[in-house]
Structure formats: C-alpha cells, structure tokens
C-alpha cells in the first residue's frame, strides 16, 4: 500500500465471502486512515448483493468524515451468491444475500447515487457491466455538474467484456479502466466464468453486445 501511495496510484482490495469479509473491511478502513488523507489511494470493495452494504456505506462515510480521510470504494454486485446461500442453509442462519436480482440492482444503484451525492468525500469506482447502472452514474454526475474527469469518479469493466460501455464512457471523457485478472489458471478461469454468468444475467444486454461485436467485425472488413 505504501508503494501505491508513493507511486500516486490506487490500490483496490477485493471483496470476499461474508464470513471472512469483516477483517478485510477493518484493514481497508485502517489503511484509508493512514494513506487517504489527501487523496484516494486504498479502495475497499462493496458487494451490493449483500443486504447490509448500503448501511455499511453510510457508516463508512461517517467514519471518513470524523477521521478526516477520503472514503474510497469500488462498487460491485457480488461474486459468491450460490456459495453464500448454500452456507446459510447448511448452518441455519439468515442469508446475507438479497432475495433477488432486482433488490441487488436497487441497492447497487442507490449506492452509486449516494457516492455521487457525496463526491467531495467519496472516491467511487463503478465496476459494472450493467448499461443502466453505468448510464445512471454518468447522468447523475452530469446533473450535479460534476466534470467527467473528476478524480473521484471512475468506471471499470473486465477486459474483453462490455467494450461498448467502456469505449463510450471513455469517449465522453470519463475515467475508465479495463480490469485484467492475473494469476494461476485454476483461480482465474472460475473467476471469469462467474463474471460471464453475471454478465449474461442482464436481460438482453449480452445479445446486444454480440450484435455490436459482429457489427464492428463487419466494419473492419470493409
């Protein structure tokens, strides 16, 4: 984290399963207190398919205000839904996961809105392949008069996915990155499969993306 701070770049801590996330949250907050005094360096990741994350976001902002540091967050929908629900059933406790996709979408978009409302104190990365959520963030920022290049607003999509979102946001002047998973094949492939499955869950979006890819291929043939 010191290396990221000294290099002037951001470092995003990934989110894990609920039963091991608390220490990650605590570490992220401690590191933000230390490194985020002047600008966003250390980012925590919030999985908005969890029922408690919207409240956690608001409490985190209060901590940032009282501690005098920038709250930096990456917003995602979530990656471990089946595992979380299965464990809750096996151990007989209430599932920490939203009951359906609509509820996850609702809290994700609410988190995006909240971050933009507090853009002076929160640095937010909207990490989503969902066109509606990405458009919502861009429209709300424009409505608030927030420049596209504001250093507290970022977007990110996986390399090889949702290029139509990435390129249009970049063309409009927003801070956009491509997320590139790196690691052993046995770890990276399951991760990419979960992301692909998540991407296909957005009604109609995958078909639209395929059509756009075919259109671009035909354009390059000419």
Model-derived segments and spans:
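Positively charged, amphipathic and often flexible ligand-engagement surfaces
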Residues: 1-222
């Amino acid at each position: 984290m010191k290396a990221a701070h000294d290099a002037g770049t951001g470092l995003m801590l990934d989110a894990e399963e609920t039963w091991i996330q608390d220490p990650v949250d605590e570490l992220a907050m401690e590191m933000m207190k230390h490194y985020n005094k002047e600008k966003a360096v250390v980012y925590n990741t919030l999985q908005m398919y969890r029922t408690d994350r919207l409240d956690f976001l608001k409490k985190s902002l209060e901590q940032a205000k009282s501690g005098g540091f920038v709250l930096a967050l990456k917003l995602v929908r979530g990656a471990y839904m089946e595992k979380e629900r299965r464990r809750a059933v096996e151990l007989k406790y209430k599932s920490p996961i939203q009951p359906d996709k609509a509820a996850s979408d609702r809290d994700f978009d609410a988190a995006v809105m909240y971050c933009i409302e507090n853009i002076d104190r929160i640095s937010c990365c909207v990490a989503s392949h969902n066109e509606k959520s990405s458009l919502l963030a861009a429209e709300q920022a424009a409505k608030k008069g927030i420049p596209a290049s504001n250093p507290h607003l970022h977007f990110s999509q996986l390399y090889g996915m949702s290029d139509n979102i990435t390129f249009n946001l970049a063309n409009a002047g927003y801070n956009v990155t491509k997320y590139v998973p790196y690691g052993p094949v046995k770890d990276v492939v399951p991760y990419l499969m979960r992301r692909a499955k998540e991407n296909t869950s957005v009604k109609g979006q995958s078909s639209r993306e395929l059509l756009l890819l075919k259109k671009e291929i035909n354009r390059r043939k000419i």
